[in-house]
Design a protein with these regions (language model features):
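Signature aromatic-anchored transmembrane alpha helix within multi-pass, membrane-resident enzymes
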Residues: 9-10, 70-74, 187-191, 241-245, ...
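C-terminal luminal/periplasmic domains and tails of membrane-associated envelope-modifying transferases
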Residues: 465-500, 505, 514-639
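Membrane-proximal lumenal/periplasmic loop motifs of glycosylation machinery
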Residues: 89-100, 114-138, 157-160, 205, ...
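Start-transfer (signal-anchor) and selected internal transmembrane alpha helices
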Residues: 1-86, 290-301
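Transmembrane-lumen/periplasm boundary regions of multi-pass, lipid-linked membrane glycan transferases
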Residues: 102, 108, 260-261, 265-271, ...
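Loop-to-helix entry region of an early transmembrane alpha helix in multi-pass inner-membrane enzymes
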Residues: 130-169, 190, 206, 346
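Short acidic/glycine- and proline-prone juxtamembrane loop motifs at membrane-interface regions
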Residues: 202-215
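Transmembrane-helix motifs of polytopic, lipid-linked glycan transferases
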Residues: 55-58, 153-184, 222, 354-361
Length: 639
């Protein structure tokens, strides 16, 4: 046995160790169900397996990282640790909405695994049809389990659970692209290209805000490494299995990564078709036909297997009207999205892309720029049919943009013989600029924090004010006072709770509920307000709440015209004296004053219909979310 093991490669020994670890976990899970150690150990195993898979992909893609590559990689990872530590420690950010979803899922996954291993894995499987699956929690539990389990802890732990595999694959992708472009100055190419891509602000933007969606980039890079220079000239079953695994992984990470998958597959098939046509014209029609046949057979088999594997998700996608339900977020279509993409990429990056396009044209190497451009265009068109992107959804376009950055880096590196100092200063300035970018919920243009705070245009002064308030809170003490008041005046055992009308980035129920994670002081004591048509139901809990909280002025941070909390607040203010009396008031210290109103008269049909009638347009679009909800509540309360 020892002789067999000794003959295995290092990677083979790693996989043997992982298999032994998996067996040990199965035995441990059966022997000690509900152990607090089981989920962290599973997470540690998953991270090790993911890293081993990344190394296996590099080997299959024919990429080998030498000592220089590894030194740069480790140095950049160490710099990322310091960066995250500094950024998270220099702000007071309160996690809410999408920024708290994964943290809550991590808590829920921990609670499920605390019951038993079966309950934990069942919890993960049951989430497959949700907008936020629990797939990532398998990888983020370790080392999160060793931390204080705050929101900042969750963001920081991603540097250890997500970033190593991501950087290894990005380094491999950089080497692969350099080889395909026949770069001569490989030292500077890798240094410039790898650092340029790794520091691109929208790679880390969501992670700094508590959203580990960049986890999907791991599988995107795997897919690109396995396919960029592969032309189906022969049958390669191990590669096919890895491509399938990478595709499944990226879809399980976030459903909207499907737009990248579709866009990339379309661009890749188009590239392969063009190369096959050229091959046929060069006198090799048989080889060209065999290429396309293998591609079609693999594509059909992979698509069929993927549908079977992700059948619950496929059913949800086919049965749910995403364009209708998410229409609120489609506030400008492709025209506005193109403008947003332009602002996010920025002038410095477009200069690099321009250099890359000129470089590719001169060397007659159009494949990679065309592949990236086609992928971006298809993904962009498909996504904007449903909605426009937020900063975290920008991740589905990141692989295409990074590919263009690498082509530009090749041009910059191979052109260093001329104007060397200017070009190196351009690279250095861009790195400093990129690292200094503020990662805020309101970030539209990637700018350093000091530039945002002192932006000279008065037209954006309100944006700057709100950006400061949401990114680095100065009202934590005031929020805690409101929390303490609600906690003292609502008895959860009696079913008492408060309802909050404001549902805005500046103030919403999540801000108050999750102000002191992992402690959730107002668990079951604070209900969220209505805001997004197609997402939020008619809020019948308003009529059950002991207290209603509103604010003056009502927070409305760059909301679209169809936003609902403003309308509800106006209706409440016009009729509140008939059913409520003022109970308390809180000055938040930033121009906003919260007022607590206590219900004095129980809700009746007339009050419910008063509010429902004001949402006739929404009711016509979503009756199952408005009139049907209201009527069911009225019937349940004998009204």
């Amino acid at each position: 046995m020892s002789g067999i093991v000794s003959r295995l490669s290092v990677l083979g020994k790693v996989w043997l160790g992982l298999a032994a670890g998996a067996l040990a976990l199965i035995v441990f899970g059966l022997a000690a169900p509900g152990s607090s150690l089981f989920f962290p150990l599973v997470s540690l195993w998953c991270n090790a397996a993911l890293f081993a898979l990344a190394l296996l992909v590099l080997r299959r893609a024919g990429v080998e990282l030498d000592l220089f590559h590894k030194a740069v990689l480790v140095g950049l990872w160490a710099a990322a640790v310091l960066y995250f530590y500094w950024v998270l420690g220099s702000r007071t950010f309160l996690y809410h909405w999408d920024y708290v979803n994964y943290i809550l899922k991590q808590y829920h996954a921990e609670a499920a695994f605390a019951q038993s291993a079966g309950a934990g894995f069942r919890f993960l499987l049951d989430s497959i049809t949700e907008d936020y699956t629990s797939f990532i929690t398998l990888f983020t539990e370790f080392p999160f389990c060793l931390s204080g389990k705050t929101g900042d802890d969750y963001a920081f732990c991603q540097v250890f659970s997500v970033l190593p595999s991501l950087l290894v694959l990005l380094a491999g992708l950089t080497v692969k692209v350099g080889r395909m472009l026949r770069v001569k100055n490989r030292f500077w190419y890798f240094l410039i290209g790898f650092s340029w891509c790794a520091t691109f602000p929208f790679v880390r933007m969501s992670a700094v805000l508590g959203q580990p969606d960049w986890f999907g980039l791991i599988f995107a890079f795997m897919l690109m490494l396995l396919t960029l220079d592969y032309r189906f000239d022969g049958i390669d079953l191990p590669r096919y299995l890895l491509i399938f695994a990478a595709t499944a992984g990226i879809i399980l990470t976030r459903r909207w990564y499907l737009y990248f998958v579709v866009g990339y597959c379309f661009a890749y098939v188009l590239m392969l078709a063009v190369s096959s046509i050229r091959l046929a014209k060069d006198g090799q029609p048989s080889r060209a036909v065999h290429r396309m046949v293998r591609l079609v057979v693999f594509g059909l088999c992979a698509a069929g297997a993927m549908v079977l594997l992700l059948l619950p998700m496929v059913r949800k996608i086919l049965s749910f009207d995403y364009a209708g339900r998410y229409s609120y977020y489609n506030f400008g279509g492709i025209t506005l999205e193109l403008a947003a993409q332009t602002l996010r990429i920025g002038l410095l990056n477009f200069i690099l892309i321009g250099m890359g396009l000129w470089f590719a044209a001169k060397r007659r190497l159009p494949a990679l720029p065309c592949l990236a451009g086609a992928e971006l265009l298809v993904s962009l068109v498909l996504f904007t049919r449903v909605q426009n992107t937020g900063s975290h959804q920008m991740l589905l376009f990141v692989p295409g943009w990074l590919l263009l950055f690498l082509v530009g880096s090749a041009a910059l590196a191979d052109g260093l013989k001329k104007h060397t100092a200017v070009k190196l200063c351009y690279w250095g300035f861009t790195m400093v600029f990129a690292v200094s970018v503020r990662c805020s919920p309101l970030t539209t243009v990637a700018l350093p924090g000091f530039v945002v705070d002192h932006f000279p245009l008065k037209a954006v002064s309100e944006f700057v004010r709100l950006d400061k308030l949401t990114y680095d809170r100065t009202d934590a003490a005031q929020i805690q006072r409101v929390d303490d008041w609600i906690d003292a005046h609502c008895d959860a055992e009696k079913g008492e709770f408060a309802y909050m009308i404001p549902h805005d980035m500046l103030y919403n129920s999540d801000i108050f509920q999750y102000a002191a994670l992992p402690d959730i002081q107002l668990q079951g004591k604070l209900a969220a307000g209505i805001s997004i048509p197609g997402t939020h139901e008619f809020p019948v809990r308003f009529f059950e709440a002991k207290y209603v909280l509103t604010a003056e002025p009502l927070p409305q941070t760059f909301v679209s015209g169809g936003e609902l909390s403003g309308r509800w607040n106006a209706l409440f203010c016009a009729a509140r004296d008939a059913h409520f009396t003022q109970a308390a008031s809180f000055d938040m210290g930033n121009g906003t004053v919260f007022t607590v109103w206590e219900r004095t008269e129980p809700a009746d049909r007339a009050e419910v219909e008063y509010y429902l009638d004001a949402f006739a347009q929404e009711d016509a679009l979503y009756p199952e979310m408005f009139s049907q909800v209201a009527e069911a509540w009225l019937a349940g309360h004998g009204l």
